[in-house]
UniProtKB/Swiss-Prot annotation:
SMART domains: GAL4
Matching CDD domains: fungal_TF_MHR (cd12148), GAL4 (cd00067)
DNA-binding region(s) from the entry: 92-122
InterPro entries tied to this protein: prtT (IPR051089), Transcription_factor_dom_fun (IPR007219), Zn2-C6_fun-type_DNA-bd_sf (IPR036864), Zn2Cys6_DnaBD (IPR001138)
Species this chain originates from: Eremothecium gossypii (strain ATCC 10895 / CBS 109.51 / FGSC 9923 / NRRL Y-1056) (Yeast)
Name of this protein: Putative transcription factor SEF1
Residue ranges, compositional bias (Basic and acidic residues): 1-10
Length: 1051
């Protein structure tokens, strides 16, 4: 073959030489044409020859791959390339597509290294042309493919493990893994979250100074690193706010130290002595490992050998952390399902802020708030450092903020609550992360942490932000800034796979947004409210829309959702109660508001049978708070029918009792919305005692505020508290009141003037019987059903309580036959205001042999019958224990009864939440010399001023007559001032003139107050409520944080 090739080459060369030689002599044109054709044919023949030679050489080279390589292979390749004019294709199609080096020609007939590693089919195709496209998209496709394979492996974990256990090789692998992990189990580690603004958590000053001077007189590396970290102008951030994808050199010095330790501890061979003798890993002295969410995965796996979590000075063992994690998943997550979590260590590796937030929330179920109080301030600081200083690239941060919004951190005043700011922060972070764009989130960030079912939980988080903002906007009376987008609309229509409760709550939140936009976003008025004349028709349409939602979604199938649904109804009615709304539009919603509010309180009492109040999310507690406040307003107005007044009053008392009915440690150690609501009710009740005219001076239900949307109700009531305080220090007002009293004629029920009737309120304003503690030995409950169908439960003192109260009064110098003033610290004036007792009941004609009178359900008893009613003592509790009053008292709802009320004390004995450790305070213990009053117990600390003002009773006069007893609390009289009794007498005369003593068929008869109504005889209950007022301090009644040092006092 080589001979033929050479001969052909020689012929071609000779022919080319002849053709290239110049022509000799003259020839014809035909000869020239023939010559040119010959040259063309020769060129074609040479090209064909070259292609055949190239194909033959390729075959020869391929055939030679199976054996040893020829030493002249490179020379042949160069000859072939020079002969063909282009390089032969030696790379496979995959390597040509990615433009990477390929060794397919060297590995033939095997695949190239990359295709063999990737499991791809390797082929050489000279006709293949690389496709032009985005390498990033290809990488995304590969990542999705890997994720699919990983999910398949995870789902097949059980099959793989069983297969490994059934094979010899698998058992050997498992045994090797156990041997490798066994030394790590002997040395646990503690992971710590550092706070930048607390350098003592990194290392204290003393430890830094002591570690600077080493025994050799030089500086240790760790001391230098820590001191350098402490002197930085910007402190290092060693939590979720650490920058993402940072290299080691750009990290803070202390974090570099932790990484150095971590890498050395894991890279040290197990057999070396240092791994066993290092004191840092011993159980006694454990070196903290700094774990960050986004910088690098410091924890080897979700099952890392962690035995302690540290934040500041709080140490949580792994067993306690697992317990709290289980409590959160079981009790709290169903209320707000925006995340999923399986293990504590995995949760910590995902986000430290989310981990500590879950630990804090689960601590609400502890019997004592010790751990909760220790974590609260630290987590607030951690949230600020994580979110404000740098922008975290994780959805977990938004989830943590939303959890803090639903179970708020402790706060005393409304403006101190960070929840609304946390909602806004979570919303802004989610915007930056692209949570509002779902699958297009990659267009916003490429450094976000990954999680299983990422798009599902990101969407849940975005929906949770929408709900939380609507809830907190309604609480504070602020307009919502969220708008309905694609995800909210799809969720509302049921296109997403959401839990039923969460779907219903989102629908109600969407309705709240529509309600606020329609009624409170007008550009025609400065307060933003719709024109008063148009409110009625708009509210009617909104009420029909809410009824339609209820018929479709069945809100009443879930008590939690039903409470929030009724809260949405109360929001509609509140818009109707705003100033300038026509009276007809207001009155038509009064009864509906009463029914909705009392239903909320009934549902709460049922829910608290198996759940503590503090475990409920804010949207449930706000529904109850709003119901109590609107009932307080309604029961003072003439628009509420008389048959509902007693039930409304008792509903308010029930809320107050439940809100004060927490475990002693929680009631005294934590201030939040629960304690604030109870305090607001107590302050309002004190205003009802001292300045009741404030509530009836203006026409309408809500009369003084108007620009807070549905939150106007709360601010209108708070205004009454501040106005009462202003009048208390206003001497001009008191002088004018005294002048009006002197000019006012004395009126009786029969001779009342028309002018007096016009100026007098239309309804008596009685105080509410709030109390903090009661024992079954002193009071028993009697339930009545009025002709209007309202169930009313009253407290009736027992025979033993009355005897002990009389004994105590006589020991203090009281005269025989004088009516008693209080029983176990509860003023009888308050019980008398609700029809519980009669003046004759506490007289000296009490006979122990008086039988118990039956209480008719169809008609209220006559005063004489009530006077003779002495209920028997209830049976003692099992084990001889007595429980305080602040336990919810329940009864089963009767048919066609709109309210559920308290039952007898025997029912309360079976309730789950008890405080057996509290000392028992009864009337007998008080009579025997126990100076503690009802509110002097640890359940509600006695004010310091009350302790100072307690004085022993003066001795009797020589002539045998008892000395005149001083007022129980002189400071209260000082606060009320010299004109207080005159003002109360003036107000009482107005009430008597406006409300003649006529029997009311819908209400139980009220006994004449007599001396019991005198203001100086109020017991410690009112002293406790007025503690801040008496001390001249506004801190206790400044619920909003309005008072400022620069504010004018007349404001």
């Amino acid at each position: 073959m080589s001979t033929d090739v050479s001969e052909r080459g020689a012929e071609a060369g000779s022919s080319s030489g002849l053709l290239s030689s110049p022509c000799v002599g003259d020839g014809s044109d035909s000869a020239q044409m023939k010559k040119r054709n010959t040259e063309t044919a020769g060129m074609k023949a040479r090209k064909k020859l070259r292609s055949e030679e190239s194909g033959l050489s390729t075959l020869v080279s391929i055939a030679s791959f199976g054996g040893q390589a020829s030493p002249d292979r490179s020379k042949v390749s160069k000859q072939q390339n020079g002969a063909s004019g282009h390089r032969p294709v030696t790379s496979c199609t995959h390597c040509r597509q990615h433009k990477i080096k390929c060794n397919a020609s060297e590995n033939f007939p095997s695949s190239c290294s990359r295709c063999e590693r990737m499991g791809l089919q390797c082929e050489i195709d000279p006709q293949f042309r690389p496709k032009k496209g985005s390498q990033l998209q290809n990488l995304k496709n590969e990542i999705e493919e890997l994720k699919t394979k990983l999910e398949f492996l995870l789902r097949s974990e059980g099959i793989l493990s069983s297969a490994m256990r059934n094979s010899d090789l698998g058992r050997q692998i498992l045994q090797a893994i156990k041997l490798q992990d066994s030394p790590q189990q002997q040395t646990g580690i503690s992971v710590q979250t550092y706070l930048a603004s607390e350098p003592e958590l990194l290392k204290s000053e003393s430890s830094v100074k002591s570690s600077v001077n080493t025994p050799s007189g030089s500086y240790s590396a760790s001391a230098v690193d820590v001191s350098r970290a402490k002197t930085n102008s910007v402190p290092p951030l060693l939590n979720d706010s650490a920058p993402a994808n940072s290299n080691r050199e750009s990290l803070p010095p202390v974090l570099q130290m932790a990484l150095k330790y971590h890498n050395s501890s894991h890279n040290t061979p197990i057999d070396t002595p240092s791994s066993h003798t290092t004191p840092m890993l011993s159980p006694e002295v454990k070196k903290p490992v700094v774990a960050t969410t986004n910088a690098m995965p410091l924890l080897p796996s979700p099952y890392a050998n962690i035995d302690e979590f540290v934040l500041g000075d709080v140490h949580i063992p792994i067993d306690k952390a697992k317990e709290l994690h289980h409590i959160f998943v079981k009790k709290y997550l169903p209320y707000f399902p925006i995340m999923t979590t399986d293990s504590v260590t995995e949760l910590y590796s995902q986000s430290q802020l989310l981990f500590w937030t879950i630990m804090l929330t689960a601590c609400l179920s502890d019997p004592e708030p010790t751990l909760y109080n220790s974590l609260a301030s630290l987590i607030k600081q951690l949230a600020i450092e994580t979110c404000w200083i740098r922008t975290p690239r994780s959805t977990h941060i938004s989830q943590a903020l939303l959890i803090l919004c639903n179970w708020p951190l402790p706060n005393q005043k409304v403006l101190d609550d960070c929840s609304y700011r946390f909602v806004g922060l979570a919303k802004s972070l989610s915007f930056q992360l692209g949570l509002h764009r779902g699958e297009f989130m990659s267009e916003f960030t490429r450094t976000q942490t990954l999680m299983p079912d990422a798009e599902k939980w990101r969407t849940r988080t975005w929906l949770g932000i929408f709900f939380a903002e609507q809830c907190w906007s309604s609480i504070l009376g602020l307009p919502s800034t969220s708008q309905t987008d694609y995800f909210i609309e799809q969720a509302r229509r049921g296109k997403f796979d959401l839990p039923v409760r969460f779907h219903r709550l989102l629908c109600l939140a969407h309705f709240q947004a529509s309600l606020s936009n329609i009624m409170g976003s007008s550009v025609e008025s400065p307060d933003g409210l719709m024109d008063a004349k148009e409110r009625g028709s708009s509210l009617a349409a909104l009420e029909r829309e809410l009824a339609r939602l209820h018929s479709e979604l069945k809100f009443d199938s879930d008590p939690v959702v039903e409470m929030y649904y009724l809260y949405a109804k109360l929001m509609i009615y509140c818009f109707a109660f705003l100033p300038e709304t026509p009276k007809a539009d207001q009155t038509q919603y009064v009864t509906e508001a009463y029914l909705a509010a009392t239903r909320i309180i009934t549902l709460l009492t049922k829910t608290l049978e198996d759940t503590q109040l503090i475990e409920l999310p804010i949207y449930v507690r706000q529904s109850v708070t709003y119901a109590a406040l609107i009932l307080f307003k309604l029961h003072l107005t003439p628009y509420l029918p008389e048959k509902y007044v007693d039930s409304a009053r008792q509903s308010i008392v029930t809320v107050h009792r439940l809100y004060r009915n927490q475990l002693t440690a929680w009631a005294t150690g934590v201030e939040n919305d629960i304690s604030r609501t109870a305090s607001v009710l107590e302050k309002l009740n004190f205003v009802l005692i001292t300045y009741p005219e404030i509530f009836v001076e203006e026409d309408g239900i809500i009369s003084r505020m108007r620009s807070h949307l549905t939150g106007t109700l709360f601010y209108d009531l708070i205004y009454c508290v501040h106005e009462a305080r202003r009048r208390q220090v206003d001497s001009e007002y008191n002088e004018m009141l005294e002048k009006n009293r002197k000019e006012q004629p004395v009126h009786t029920a029969a001779t009342g003037s028309q002018d007096t009737e016009k100026r007098a309120p239309k309804r008596r304003l009685f105080p509410l019987p709030f109390y903090n503690q009661i024992s079954k030995e002193d009071f028993e409950t009697i339930t009545q059903t009025t002709p209007g169908g309202t169930t009313v439960t009253t407290l009736v003192p027992t025979k033993n309580a009355i005897l002990q109260a009389k004994k105590l009064q006589r020991s203090q110098g009281g005269q025989k036959g004088e009516p008693i003033r209080s029983i176990n610290g509860i003023p009888l004036a308050m019980l008398d205001a609700t029809g519980s007792v009669n003046g004759a009941l506490v007289g000296d004609n009490l006979n122990s042999s008086v039988p118990q009178a039956a209480v008719a359900a169809s008609a209220p008893p006559e005063p004489a019958a009530v006077a003779a009613t002495v209920p028997p003592e209830p049976a003692p509790a099992p084990g001889g224990q007595s429980y305080p009053l602040f336990q919810p008292l329940y009864v089963q709802p009767a048919a066609n009864v709109p309210m559920q009320r308290s039952a007898s004390a025997s029912v309360a004995e079976a309730l789950p939440f008890r405080r057996p450790g509290m000392p028992k305070i009864t009337s007998e213990s008080i009579a025997s010399g126990n100076p503690n009053s009802l509110f002097g117990n640890d359940g509600s600390p006695f004010p310091a001023i009350a302790q100072k003002s307690a004085k022993p009773a003066p001795p009797a006069k020589p002539d045998g007559q008892p000395a005149k007893q001083p007022a129980p609390y002189p400071n209260l009289n000082v606060f009320l001032g010299a004109n207080a009794s005159a003002r109360m007498a003036s107000y009482s005369s107005l009430m008597d003139a406006a409300d003649p003593l006529a029997p009311d068929p819908d209400r139980a008869p009220l006994a004449a107050p007599g001396p019991l109504a005198h203001i100086s005889e109020l017991d410690s209950f009112f002293l406790q409520q007025s503690a801040g007022w008496i001390e001249g301090s506004s801190s206790n009644d400044d619920f909003l944080g309005w008072y400022d040092i620069n504010m004018a006092p007349e404001f």
